[in-house]
Amino acid sequence: MNKLFSFWKRKNETRSQGYNLREKDLKKLHRAASVGDLKKLKEYLQIKKYDVNMQDKKYRTPLHLACANGHTDVVLFLIEQQCKINVRDSENKSPLIKAVQCQNEDCATILLNFGADPDLRDIRYNTVLHYAVCGQSLSLVEKLLEYEADLEAKNKDGYTPLLVAVINNNPKMVKFLLEKGADVNASDNYQRTALILAVSGEPPCLVKLLLQQGVELCYEGIVDSQLRNMFISMVLLHRYPQFTASHGKKKHAK
């Protein structure tokens, strides 16, 4: 899962808030947007060979780079210049995805206010909601839901935002998503539900939280027998704490 939301640094590259940038790959316009140099950006756009929607070798526009680096003034200026808001880069990521991925909430808010689509998917079918959940930002998740982001969107692995929260062991996010109506019985491509994924991870409080939501007690997606037994034990412990406690004492006495 972590590989879906991580960025790998190559030789001669510098990290730039979610984009690995090499100077030789950037046009002057893109470099200005990346560093937030609004004055230079305006100067370049007055030259005919530069266009507000110009893409680099990886199909990134100035808006992508400004959003990735949190330059709200540049974002507002580019939108005023009628730039495309839902344009995609080489990984199918929109400027909104980059803003959320890099946790630049102000940039994300601006884009949403100007009609950015919260349900566009990147090359792995992740939406902005997947990235917001992975970034553990409750405020971003709440904002995206206000703009009707799809709470049940699945990426290529079949993970909904709720499953991402469970995999990342984030009880607060799990509880928040459930309160917002997330399907507690949604499953991934291997038929693993939130409960099954929670049993195999930490902390165990996630299991209790999910069981309190009336989750379906199905363990068909658990291939490992040891994990299956753990699943059954934890369910029994939640449902019949007195029985399991006394059973454990008898076993220990023997």
UniProtKB/Swiss-Prot annotation:
* UniProt superkingdom: Eukaryota
Q: Which UniProt keywords apply?
A: ANK repeat, Repeat
Which InterPro entries does the annotation name? Ankyrin_repeat_domain, Ankyrin_rpt, Ankyrin_rpt-contain_sf
Tissue expr: Testis specific.
The residue spans of each ANK repeat are: 58-87, 91-120, 124-153, 157-186, 190-219
Q: Name one GO cellular component term.
A: centrosome
User: What PANTHER family has UniProt attached to this entry?
Assistant: ANKYRIN REPEAT DOMAIN 36-RELATED, ANKYRIN REPEAT DOMAIN-CONTAINING PROTEIN 7
Tell me the protein's name. Ankyrin repeat domain-containing protein 7
Q: Which organism is it from?
A: Homo sapiens
- Gene encoding the protein: ANKRD7
